[in-house]
Amino acid sequence: MESANTLCPGRKCKGGVLAHLERLEAQTNISNRKSEEPAVRKKESSLRTKIRELRQQRDKLRAEVKQWGARVKEPPAKEDPSRTVISEQEVLEREWRNVDAILEAYRFTGLSGKLTSRGVCMCISTAFEGNLLDSYFVDLVIEKPLRIHHHSVPVFIPLEKIAAAHLQTDVQRFLFRLWEYLNAYAGRKYQADQLESDFCDVLTGPLQRNALCNLLSFTYKVEQRCQTFSFSARLLYEDPTAALPTNVTVTRPGVEASSPPWEEHRASHQMLFRTKPLHKVFASFSKETEKLHLNLVS
């Protein structure tokens, strides 16, 4: 009793010595918490974040364990000889759906097609500057692997190379890439045909071209300042999907290349051939000649 009174001088201790000690400890803890409150809050926030992360990981692991357990509980599947056939059938059905989507997407473009009993027959239409040109078809058989049954693509178009790169993995990419080749070829051929038919009086020799129309050479004449000048041109189309040349060489027989007037004409003609369709270049030459004649008359 004396011990208790010593710990509680002047008043009675409620609950005994242990209770009094607990109260003192609680008061001390409160005081400490007040002094450490900012650090504690920061630590608590960090712990809450960590707890959330751990709970997310726990939930994820629980889901994986549950999924794995369901698989383990499943009875072993019996060998089904038709399983492979069904799987292949599903793949083919998916290919059919892809083809339908392609036909719908290309309804208003240069590509169109119709479904056949074996697959789809695609029609690839070409055009240049609003002029409809030749059309080609590719008959595809929808099976694994996809294959080309018939086609009307010219032999100099690398159809097999394009098919090997894209047909089995991306049919749309295959068709678009093939269209690029065919459309560029048709555009180059159209320009050469226009030059021969509409500007034959300007050509001083035959237009030479290869089957792909990616190499053209010709000689032509241009009237300037009451004089007629002859030029030779060589146009190379290194990009098979381009309708304009990548390399142009213009020469003039018997004239020094270093001559300033000649160099100016050469550079001007080369720039025109690189940036404009062939027949439009010669149309501009004709307009310049007409202007010159009008100026002389007036």
Swiss-Prot record:
Protein name: Centromere protein O
Gene name of the record: Cenpo
Parts forming coiled coils: 39-74
Organism: Mus musculus (Mouse)
Family: Belongs to the CENP-O/MCM21 family.
Signal sequence residues: none
Function as written in the Swiss-Prot or TrEMBL entry: Component of the CENPA-CAD (nucleosome distal) complex, a complex recruited to centromeres which is involved in assembly of kinetochore proteins, mitotic progression and chromosome segregation. May be involved in incorporation of newly synthesized CENPA into centromeres via its interaction with the CENPA-NAC complex. Modulates the kinetochore-bound levels of NDC80 complex.
Major location category of this protein: nucleus
Keywords: Centromere, Chromosome, Coiled coil, Kinetochore, Nucleus, Phosphoprotein
